Amino acid sequence: MTRLKTKLSALLPFIGLLCAQAQRDMKTINDGWFFRKASTENWQPVNVPHTYNLDAYSQRNYYMGKAFYQKSFVLPEVPQGKRCFLKIDAASKAADLTLNGQKIGSHAGGYSAFTFDITPYIQKNNTIEITVDNSRKDITPISADFTFWGGIYRDVWLITTSEQHFNLLNHGSDGIFISTPHVDEKEATIEIRSEITNDATEKATLEVIHQIYDPQGKLQQTLKQRLSVKAGETQTVRKTSAIGQPQLWSPESPRLYEIVTTLRNPKTGMELDRSTHKTGFRWFSFDGEKGFSLNGKPYKLRGVNRHQDQAPVGVALDDEAHRRDIRLIKEMGCNFIRIAHYPQDDALVEACDEMGLLAWEEIPIINIVPDTPGYDDNCETNLTEMIRQHYNHPSIIAWGYMNEILLTAPGPDRPEWPACRERTVKLAQRLEKTLKQEDPYRASVMAFNMTNLYNEIGLDLVDVSGWNLYHGWYVGQLNDFNRWMEDQHARYPKRPTIISEWGAGSDRRLHSRHPKAFDFSIEYQQTYVEHYLPFIEGTEYISGCTYWNFIDFNVAARQESMPRVNNKGLFYNDRTPKDVSYYFKAMWRKDTPVLHIASRDWPVRTGDKNEKHPVKIYTNLDEVELIINGKSIGKQRPANCHTVFNVTLPYGTSTLKAQGYKNGQMVEDVMVLRLDAMPDLAKGDELAINVGSDCAFTSDVSGLTWLPDQPYSKGSWGYIEGKARSTTSEIENTTDGPLYQTWRENLRAYQIDAPSGTYEVELLMADVSRSRPQLANLLGRGDDGQAIADSRFNITICGRRVETDFSPADGGHYRQAFRRRYIIQNKENKIDVLFETLKGKCHLTGIKIRKL
């Protein structure tokens, strides 16, 4: 790498690096870095955390490749009798490091920390150079339904210790491991395993001291142990003790004990190193019939999956953002989280301990096990790093190591299947063995997708089977979910199960009175969760669930209604809650009243003031009253924490208030909703129609609402003949993609009855007759119509031929939106758009009418 000269003039003084006591000193060195991609020579000043993939928010083919980071700093004096370490909390997905021109090490894996001893290379003036590469195919994951963010996106630490210290080179851990092999209400056993390194040139006699403080900060026990460590060696010592009447940890009462571990010289009393950890005493079990239990009592796991990105910073989040997410998840009523699909920041796991969330953490082995040299070794290293780095966290109850690993594997009818099956099972067996050797006290878990092959080929070797089920979204009907779980339990009644993923996408621009799977309406997502959640809650053998996903998260390869986004979240990417999140809160929060008018995602509607408009309410109250503009509409008793009032609304704004009582105290929620009248062409309104769709679409750019399609009736408007079609492929050259992802095919005409006059008629189209190949895990229900090499048709409006021998593919409009406007004379009190098919199939995706 080219060394920076004039640019790297910023120096970092580490005053206080050498403290009077020889104890550990840790400092972040996140500021003052310079960065460039391999494709450019232009260095840019940056701070870490940093990612070089903000392009993933705007383009499918985001940058995959190498990038370089460089930083210079000065030490006031070279630390004699000290050891210096460089720790990077994460760099994705491979990193090569040099210090002062000398290579100090490499790391393969984008989600775990790694530490190097830089003592031999440190001097007064120092330059760190780090090459990061997010494109490596020999490092897991090789494919996934999330963006492979590149960069140094977590903290960088400079650590100094004495020559005798706890081992910092054990897979990114700090060399201290705390377990609680036995816990009950009367007594708990704690075991502390410490690794001590002597980097001096002489043998050292040392003492390890563990001070155990209870949750109130009172010293409970002091454990001491002497040892002798030869020069240049690392020695492991164990100390076990009993804690009487332990204060148990649970999500409701996350009581944490603090353990301060000190290494000292017993002759001089000098403190050489110190490390502080927190632990909690709890015991748990998974059972195939009775589900999950915590501290001896039945306990339903209620949670979400969590990805770690947030626009506009990608995955380069600060600690406060991680803690905020756990707080939001906890406030929603969760007691459980699946940290998916990779190990996440220490701040997040610490927050789980402190705020009370049980956790499943996993490494990112996803979709398929490739036939790639070194891949299995890399997976095992990833697993070992995750377990050792987060071993001490009481919130973690399960380690996972594969997600939907057969999703893109060849089917059993393919010649490649036997070899793929063998690779997959062999790796699973290897990782299961490693997991149990590393941590015999937690459960192993794997997430299966919707096939029984996992049971048939031996991937059910884990303690708990997780099912990623999307019946009623990607496949089948909602009731198929119930049938699937009932069938699995009948076949394998002793096997513990959890619903590790389930979810439906939603786009706040889309609303439907008749929601259906894959329309991406806010209403279908609500319908979906209102079916799944009561079944999960009411089925004893299901240990619990983690909804997919906590947030709308970035997937550069995703298309659908919101390209670059998986929009199944209960919160938007900016962490604003969707209405549907309050359904979970109403179902799960027993400690506080919940009352929410679920119309924040649909605050502006278009319709007739005499028709009924649904107003949904999520609540855990026994009864709720709805008041509109000061007038009571009535009271209803919710079923499964939701109810719908069908009400008439005046045009303009209305104040809606829902109220009820909990323990004699009034609870209320208030919002303002606006009803706009149906467009009146005679008054100059624009009539915009989302052809081929049952959804209304409101543009977030113009604010214009495109009404759902309907068949023509006299005095109104609508289609004449034709079949509704849809696609999940991205439509380019527009921000209003959903308008072009549904269309009516082979329609004879579209007619709008309107007063005579001059009109502007705008037709929306795209070349939707051909499908763009999608990634295997980007499933969908869009039928894309029938693939037609070329479709040609004539279009006539009010007797005037406006397009002759026309094809949407003309002019390179493949999957690209285009709109054409025509000035038309309406002389017969109707605007009729006639289609004459010459070849293939005609179609229309949208139409807008305006009287001039």
What does each model-found stretch correspond to?
Residues 165-199, 585-620, 679-685:
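Surface beta-strand/loop "capping" patches
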Residues 29-32, 51-58, 118-190, 275-283, ...:
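An acidic-aromatic loop/edge-strand motif
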Residues 22-89, 140-143, 149-152, 169, ...:
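Extended carbohydrate-recognition surfaces in non-catalytic/accessory domains of CAZymes
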Residues 120-125, 193-287, 644-646, 650-653, ...:
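Extended acidic/polar, glycine-enriched regions
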Residues 676-852:
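Compositionally biased, intrinsically disordered or flexible polar/acidic segments
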Residues 36, 64-169, 173-175, 199, ...:
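Accessory beta-strand-rich segments of carbohydrate-active enzymes
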Residues 21-60, 74, 127, 131, ...:
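Accessory carbohydrate-binding/adhesion or oligomerization-edge regions at the termini
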Residues 48-59, 102, 135, 145, ...:
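Extended substrate-binding grooves/exosites of carbohydrate-active enzymes
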